[in-house]
Design a protein with these regions (language model features):
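Glycine-rich phosphate-binding active-site loops on the catalytic face of alpha/beta enzymes
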Residues: 1, 47-54, 87-99, 130-163
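N-terminal polybasic phosphate/anion-binding patch
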Residues: 1-9, 212
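Alpha-helix-loop-beta-strand connector modules within alpha/beta enzyme cores
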Residues: 9-27, 47-71, 99-127, 160-168
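Catalytic cores of alpha/beta
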Residues: 26-41, 55, 70-82, 114-121, ...
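Conserved SAM-binding loop
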Residues: 27-28, 44, 67, 149, ...
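Asp-based, Mg2+/Mn2+-dependent phosphohydrolase catalytic module
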Residues: 139, 149-158, 162-189
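Active-site neighborhood of HAD-like aspartate-dependent phosphohydrolases
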Residues: 180-216
Length: 216
């Protein structure tokens, strides 16, 4: 963000060549004019940035437009305005941005369940905490320091990619178990079961512990 406009554009064009070679979409953060100038695949907009409709008019119908959403209301509005995906967070405490408060995972899950478009978890996601996103129904994650703050960027990228795939697979398993078990558990105030679907316990106290201590 400290680069001059010309330097930023030159670097964006070089990155575009690289992402195009590997079939990876290039999404520019905030800057719609730059996204158009470098022929990026899309743009990500914050709550204080240009409206989705304006960005769409500039970039065209094929552009991928993402919007930051920190609660269900923002998520629903962005979806209504035509966003293609949401970036929600901060999922965890992050050092990349200052004065950012982590969302409860409950809120992240509520956002995912409220909209029909993909939701990407952003903020503080790392190799150490990514499995906490299992069951939140996120479609993916966005990271900075988890890769670029590491000594071996390529190694960190490969490791995190594998962990993301594993997290998404576990989420699919979690959702399948949920759909299977819920009809059997109607009327229960709280249940505890492991990831292979084995019911461990069913008592009202679990619901209290869930809300009061886990915050989910």
């Amino acid at each position: 963000k400290e680069l001059s406009e010309d330097a930023f554009l030159a670097e964006a064009k070089e990155i575009k060549k690289l992402t195009q070679r590997y079939g990876v979409p290039l999404i520019i953060n905030d800057n719609v004019a730059l996204a158009k100038a470098c022929q990026a695949d899309g743009v990500h907009l914050g709550q204080g940035d240009m409206q989705v409709e304006e960005a769409r008019a500039i970039l065209g119908d094929a552009a991928i437009i993402g919007v930051s959403a920190h609660n269900v209301e923002e998520a629903l509005l962005a979806e209504k305005q035509g966003a293609d995906y949401l970036g929600s967070g901060s999922a965890f405490v992050t050092t990349t941005k200052q004065d950012v408060t982590a969302l409860p995972l409950k809120t992240l899950r509520e956002i995912c369940h409220a909209v029909q478009i993909p939701v990407v978890a952003i903020g503080g996601v790392s190799a150490e905490n990514i499995n906490q996103l299992v069951g939140c129904d996120v479609a993916g994650v966005a990271v900075v320091s988890a890769i670029f703050a590491q000594d071996e960027i390529e190694t960190a990228t490969k490791k995190l990619t594998a962990q993301v795939k594993d997290m998404l697979a576990k989420t699919e398993t979690f959702d399948a178990l949920y759909q299977k078990l819920m009809p059997l558990l109607q009327g229960k105030k709280g249940v505890l079961f492991d990831m292979d679907g084995t019911l461990i316990d069913s008592m009202p106290m679990w619901r209290t512990l869930d809300v009061e201590y886990i915050g989910r």
